[in-house]
Amino acid sequence: MRRKIIEWHPNPAAEGWEQTEPDGVVWVDVTKLDAAWQRTEQYVLPGGANGQGSRYERVEQWFEENCYSNMFFAVICDDGIEFGEGRHRFAWLRDRGVEAIQLQVPSDQEHHFIFQFGTELRESVLMA
């Protein structure tokens, strides 16, 4: 097995949103975040069993050839956390034992994410 370090790229602001406060960027513990995500309807089961189409499988194809990804976007909601983008990538990396990821979050939730899900790790290691 080969050790891959994933390089995270921030998502640029969408057209018309350039003047808004930029997203917060945090390092989170995958296990902690997954526990909060399990309580929501959008949770992707291990193996991608309830994922959308072939999105889960396409993540594997991507990481076979690449060592980078756009950051996921998540928000804290009443039920736990929800992804605005990246839930299939998160599930696939979770299932491969990645322990930490870099995530984009609303700036007003940045400290909550750090407090609830933060980690001292600063690398996303994928054994491929």
Labelled PLM ranges:
Residues 2, 13, 22-84, 94-95:
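Short alpha-helix boundary/capping and kink motifs at helix termini
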Residues 68-121:
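A short, basic-hydrophobic beta/loop patch
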Residues 122-128:
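A polyampholytic, Gly/Pro-enriched intrinsically disordered region
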